[in-house]
Amino acid sequence: MSLNLFWFLPTHGDGHYLGSDAGARPVDHGYLQQIAQAADRLGFTGVLIPTGRSCEDAWLVAASMIPVTQRLKFLVALRPSVVSPTVAARQAATLDRLSNGRALFNLVTGSDPQELAGDGVFLDHTARYEASAEFTRVWRRLLEGEKVDFEGKHIKVRGAQLLFPPVQQPRPPLYFGGSSDVAQDLAAEQVDLYLTWGEPPEQVKEKIAQVRAKAAAHGRTVRFGIRLHVIVRETTEEAWQAADRLIAHLDDETIAKAQAAFARQDSVGQQRMAALHGGRRDQLEISPNLWAGVGLVRGGAGTALVGDGPTVAARINEYAALGIDSFILSGYPHLEEAYRVGEFLFPHLDVAIPDVPQPRPLTAQGEAVANEFIPRRVAQS
């Protein structure tokens, strides 16, 4: 099975060390462009662009990278409860059209009540997933060309429609990650690819089995992906030295503050990440070549595969054997590590190198009439 390998645009900052401004690097448009172009040339399928108050806006960053890349896809966040499904569908179709079919979408419900309150969202965990499920039903139907009337507990639309369809048909793929029961229910019913953070293989195997069973109950199948950091070097010894250097400037106070911030979140996935290391730095190899040091201070994905190319490839193939076909990777600093992954890891994997998409002609049309419909040619009698 050919694997889809993604990279990451660090719009929330980058550098040589975690939890310190030592070795930090300005993240401006030029730097993000360098990373995107490196990923494009090396053969990564796409890039994940993060979302949240600590990040630049993912949609604007993705749009700015379209003209400077050829085949790279952009995985950007859909934010239920922050934007209406109709507006989000319109934005999604436009991004897909502007990129000639290179848009992918990642449903993000949010996990930090404090940050969500700042965005005007005051729903609890269960209610957020209810709202996300309603949002996704409307969003999918609109992109698939339906005119939608919908009234739910959280969302109500009447006569919603898109005049300009996406390039990808029936619609661009929808990604989603969540470890709670309600999250898995949503994934099973509506998404195309279920994402997990980099837990040990046995835990990932259990989650995949749960989502597969729930999807089968809906008569559906779901693809699977995993989010991991990577520290790959010419030798495994060098890789572990690089892992140690990454947290060399971390002190106990910084770790404690980070873990306290994570503890206020209601994300089951974040709780599972924190449990892998318990805030301690003395037992960070939690599974062969799987290192939890990143999660001491980084929210979300907190584990890294560490080793030389053949070793990391073997671990990736262990996950692939569980049914995972997409790997969203990253490393610090992201420009240099993109090249290390391309040079040291890619030769040992069956990587699905994307083709350069050919321009797809769009149907000729005049200006929308009364902002309501597209004019059609009238047959002459």
UniProtKB/Swiss-Prot annotation:
Record's catalysed reaction(s): an alkanesulfonate + FMNH2 + O2 = an aldehyde + FMN + sulfite + H2O + 2 H(+)
Q: What else is known?
A: FMNH(2) which is absolutely required for this enzymatic reaction, is provided by SsuE.
Q: Quaternary structure per UniProt?
A: Homotetramer.
Q: Which cysteine pairs are covalently linked by disulfides here?
A: none
* Stored SUPFAM superfamilies: Bacterial luciferase-like
Q: From what organism does this protein derive?
A: Cronobacter sakazakii (strain ATCC BAA-894)
Task: Name the gene for this chain.
Answer: ssuD
Q: What functional role does this protein have? A: Catalyzes the desulfonation of aliphatic sulfonates.
Q: Does the keyword Oxidoreductase apply?
A: yes
| Keywords of the record | Flavoprotein, FMN, Monooxygenase, Oxidoreductase
- Top-rank taxon of the source lineage equals Bacteria
Q: Which residues form a coiled coil?
A: none
Name listed for the protein in its UniProt record:
Alkanesulfonate monooxygenase
